[in-house]
Amino acid sequence: MTTNMLDLFIEEASEHLQALNDNLLQLEKDPTNGQLVSEIFRSAHTFKGMSATMGFQQVADLTHAMENVLDEVRNNRLAVTEHLVDIIFTCTSHLETMVSDIQHGGQGAADISKTVADLEALLHPEQETDTAVEKTYRIAIQIEEAAILKAVRAVMCLERLAEMGIISETTPDREAIELEEFEHSFEVVLETAQTKEEIEAVILDISEIEKVTVTEEVEEVQIIEPIKKAAKQTTKRLENKTIRVQLEKIEKLMNVFEESVIERARIDEIAEKTNNKELMEHLGRFSSISKEIQNGLLNMRMVPVDSVFNRFPKMVRTLAKELGKKIDLVIEGADTEVDKIVIDEIGDPLVHLIRNSVDHGAETVEVRRKNGKNETATINLKAFHSGNNVVIEIVDDGAGINKRKVLEKAIAKNVVTRAESTKMTDSEIFDLLFDSGFSTADQVSDLSGRGVGLDVVRNTILKIGGKISVESSENAGSTFRIEIPLTLSIIQSMLVATSERRYAVPLANVAEAITINPADIQHVHGKDLINYRETIIEVLDLGECFHETPLTDTDELLLLVVKNAKRTFGLIIKDIIGQREIVLKTLGGFFSESQIAFSGATILGDGRVVLILNLETF
């Protein structure tokens, strides 16, 4: 078995599993939809064939048992019930685990005996059934030459045949047929329990069909042919539209480009020092070209948030059943694109927030009825672009957050005093939820409420330059809003100097730079404040924040006014070096989770390493 074959199997298996889960969720809402049943059967059938071909026998056995049940449903001998859907979902969970095992070098081994027994029980084996044997037919269909809409007639034929069984091949392929890229005839390979006569009758019932020839095919067992065929079809499809590239290759290319940005910065400094205008002119043109390359590379790394969102419908369904709740998960903006690196970081925080909404937000059916609500709770998961950020919102119509309970817990843990609590805004109260170990759950549940979640969620979001906020109204619901950058690689920044070091400040956070008189600074309750455009803002000495010598002994101070998600404030600095496009490098294990004042570091043209401030932590 080659690595390419295994990679293709993993990729195809993941796609079929996602299709199974998506269609099962729809079937649960529309149990009489025969087309959905056919789609689910087709996915299971293909999965079985792929697994058997690759030698993963347990996977093949489980999908074969699934296929038997689905075939009974497809032929109206078994009804779609909640119990049946539950068992099929259990199967897909097993399959996900088995495919993961294969991906990590295993053989997909798992204890599936109980699940297979549950599937067999659905079939009532004690009752004799007259099940027709499926056969494979090659069907040649010829459309009348005078037909005006050949593609329409051909697609109608394909849809009718799909209702009768599994279409394993079309010549030409489906896309070419839909685009009318064929003469007057095409061929279909169909697996079905129907007879030749029944197939012919169905096709000839469609107008403008001139001739149908149905020939039974003898199936040849070939060990690797199905996978080769899939690879051939995939290659043909990709030649026309796309090409799949491993993320590692894009990362290597991006790293090389990032080095070129650093080298360009060095040449910029040389050009400035030598005042070489011709070199500066060429560098300007080179910068434009670099920008296009950068945009192209970043676009290659953009993936839809659906790659994370698609795991949640099944998760919410499972958790809701465990808790005896009725919950609808509504997803909006699943096609919103964001950097693959960012996507990889936000998966776990979103899992925790959605589990929180299911566990603490959504009420039981009885409580919702008592409060005059629809017995089914709704959780909305939304994604949309906002400037250079992607916004993700988790909105529920549940119980909301009890502010009094939050404050009492905070006072008990000495996070705030009772006097301070009386002056706190709603936003400040909800921010307490993100303190380490904070939880208002009456009892610890298996899902959440252990007080080890929301602080980790916030720290993860902050580490990627994002921010998180909460809005809530008791008995009306809560909204958790996450803003994350589109990409983490290259950012526009303002380079500033303190008494001892240089720092990079993301340009998106900078409002303006002004000079102030030290006498204008007022000391109130341990904070330094100034009047900025008729608003009182806090002033921080940036160097002093990192144990450097303060700059307050001068006659005039340079103040960089910056904004984060919560507030506007000022940073006292020694000098502004200038605006730079910088490459953001992560700090890895150099800083612990509690030291998140920096989102990363960069290398300047002169070789200096500069830390990049994460102003959301100030």
From Swiss-Prot:
Q: Name one GO cellular component term.
A: cytoplasm
One of the GO biological process terms: chemotaxis
Catalytic activity field: ATP + protein L-histidine = ADP + protein N-phospho-L-histidine
Question: Looking at the keywords, is Phosphoprotein present?
Answer: yes
Superkingdom of the source species? Bacteria
Q: Does the keyword Nucleotide-binding apply?
A: yes
Instruction: Give all residue intervals belonging to the CheW-like domain.
Output: 490-618
PROSITE patterns, A to Z: CHEW (PS50851), HIS_KIN (PS50109), HPT (PS50894)
Q: What is its EC number?
A: 2.7.13.3
UniProt keyword list? ATP-binding, Chemotaxis, Cytoplasm, Kinase, Nucleotide-binding, Phosphoprotein, Transferase, Two-component regulatory system
Top EC class per UniProt?
transferase
- Gene3D superfamilies on file: Histidine kinase CheA-like, homodimeric domain (1.10.287.560), Histidine kinase CheA-like, P2 response regulator-binding domain (3.30.70.1110), Histidine kinase-like ATPase, C-terminal domain (3.30.565.10), HPT domain (1.20.120.160), SH3 Domains (2.30.30.40)
Any one Gene Ontology MF annotation carried by this entry is: ATP binding
Record localization = Cytoplasm
Where the record annotates domain HPt, the positions are 1-102
Q: Which cysteines are joined by disulfide bonds?
A: none
Q: Which residues carry this modification: Phosphohistidine?
A: H45
Enumerate the spans annotated as Histidine kinase domain. 233-488
Q: What does this protein do?
A: Involved in the transmission of sensory signals from the chemoreceptors to the flagellar motors. CheA is autophosphorylated; it can transfer its phosphate group to either CheB or CheY.
Q: Which PANTHER family does the record cross-reference, listed alphabetically? A: CHEMOTAXIS PROTEIN CHEA, SENSOR HISTIDINE KINASE CHEA
- Official protein name in the record: Chemotaxis protein CheA
**Origin species:** Listeria innocua serovar 6a (strain ATCC BAA-680 / CLIP 11262)
Q: What does the organism's lineage look like at the top?
A: Bacteria, Bacillati, Bacillota, Bacilli, Bacillales
